[in-house]
A protein has these predicted regions:
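Residue-level recognition of tetratricopeptide repeat
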Residues: 2, 66, 100, 135, ...
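Register position in tetratricopeptide repeats
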Residues: 6, 70, 104, 139-140, ...
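Single-residue signature of alpha-solenoid repeat helices
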Residues: 13, 77, 111, 146-147, ...
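Hydrophobic/aromatic packing residues within the alpha-helices of TPR/SEL1-like helical repeat arrays
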Residues: 17, 81, 115, 150-154, ...
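Structural marker of alpha-solenoid helical repeat scaffolds
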Residues: 23, 87, 118-123, 156-157, ...
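TPR alpha-solenoid repeat register
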Residues: 29-30, 60, 94, 128-129, ...
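Canonical tetratricopeptide repeat
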Residues: 32, 63, 97, 132, ...
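TPR-adjacent "capping" and linker segments in tetratricopeptide-repeat scaffold/adaptor proteins
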Residues: 45-60, 193-196, 200
Length: 354
């Protein structure tokens, strides 16, 4: 985009941005699309010039920094970021990656200090700032204060775009306010074209929210529509199949879907857990143990996985080990009240009908 704008090919730049969806685009692409939509072409040259060798080298170093960051090598990532910023100090958007690196290193004070450099005039980067501040509040305090912060700031935004609606819906979903999440996912879906690349993902997220409030009819409808758009999506197949297993509904069909999901994403711990649980429900406890053991090794802090593994161990007459894993769940902060109540009963009575 920068090259097209700098060479006066604004209409070509517009054509490119027409195909960009805010929801699934990078931060920089979204900000560039926003500038073009608002005829702020001059903003590109304020931060980058294709004719400036330092700017071009700085961009290359920024890409290297991204690669190191994606491998969790934050020290090397910051090294290349500092070089990039030295060569092109105008490109303040490097700061977003520096902030992410500090955040993942749990250095929240440094992250908060740098976040203040992102101003309202660049609305996508400012929204990134608000989201990251909310995430830090969640880490340092709690999810409720985090949600209140992002909601109050969202209300001040004039004509929020679909990306902002999407992010707010995700905040509501993370905070288990599923009805509010559904409202915002629905607003997005109502605005999307049928050919939109992101529609299946939004349907999946809304379906998951419906499932959490036990509105299974609407949940199934969303999951199935998402699968019509993207038939091989492993995560939608997994979520729908697991929901059916929990409801003792279409067990054979659920197993078939899980096998497809597992073939596509055999390293995903949630899918491994689901297929293990499917074998448990079909009373193939040896196969179930194989998968659930792997899942609990990959996610030792997940309460559902530990509960499932405990159930399988019980059915294999390894009752002391079963109680050990159930007891683990009782110590986990993420364990929901309903699960804790069930495990307290199992700790005393064991598995019923075993």
């Amino acid at each position: 985009m920068s090259y097209l704008v700098e060479t006066g090919k604004n209409e070509d730049a517009k054509k490119i941005t027409n195909d960009i969806e805010f929801i699934n685009s990078t931060l920089l692409l979204s900000q560039g699309k926003s500038w073009i939509e608002n005829n702020q072409y001059y903003r590109f040259q304020e931060v980058f010039s294709c004719k400036n060798y330092n700017d071009v080298i700085a961009e290359f170093l920024f890409l290297i920094s991204n690669l190191y960051s994606s491998d969790d090598n934050f020290e090397k990532s910051n090294f290349y970021l500092n070089l990039s910023s030295f060569l092109n100090p105008k490109f303040k958007f490097n700061l977003s990656l520096i902030i992410e690196n500090h955040y993942f290193n749990k250095d929240y004070n440094k992250a908060k200090k740098i976040l203040k450099n992102l101003k309202k005039e660049d609305k996508f980067y400012y929204w990134f700032r608000l989201k990251k501040e909310a995430q830090i509040i969640s880490k340092e305090r709690n999810d409720k204060e985090s949600l209140n912060f992002i909601v109050s700031n969202f209300k001040r935004i004039n004509q929020p775009n679909k990306k902002f609606l999407f992010d707010l819906a995700n905040f509501y979903k993370k905070s288990k306010e599923y009805k509010n999440a559904i409202d915002y996912y629905t607003k997005i879906i109502d605005e999307l074209d049928d050919e939109s690349d992101v529609k299946s993902d939004i349907l999946y997220r809304r379906g998951a929210s419906y499932e959490r409030i036990k509105d299974y009819e609407k949940a199934d409808r969303d999951f199935l529509e998402a699968l019509e758009i993207n038939p091989g999506d492993a995560y939608t197949l997994n979520y729908l199949a697991y929901s059916w297993l929990e409801r003792d509904y279409k067990i054979d069909k659920a197993m078939d879907m899980l096998k497809i999901a597992y073939e596509a994403e055999s390293d995903d711990p949630y899918i491994i857990d689901s297929i293990g649980w499917a074998y448990f429900l079909t009373r193939d406890y040896l196969k179930a143990e194989k998968f659930l053991k792997q899942a609990v090794e990959l996610m030792p802090e997940d309460p559902i996985v530990n509960d499932h593994y405990g159930d399988i161990l019980w059915m294999l007459d390894r009752k002391i080990q079963a109680r050990y894993f159930w007891n683990n769940v009782l110590q986990m902060k993420e364990a929901e009240k309903e699960l804790i109540e069930k495990i307290n009963i199992k700790m005393i009575e064991g598995l019923k009908n075993s």
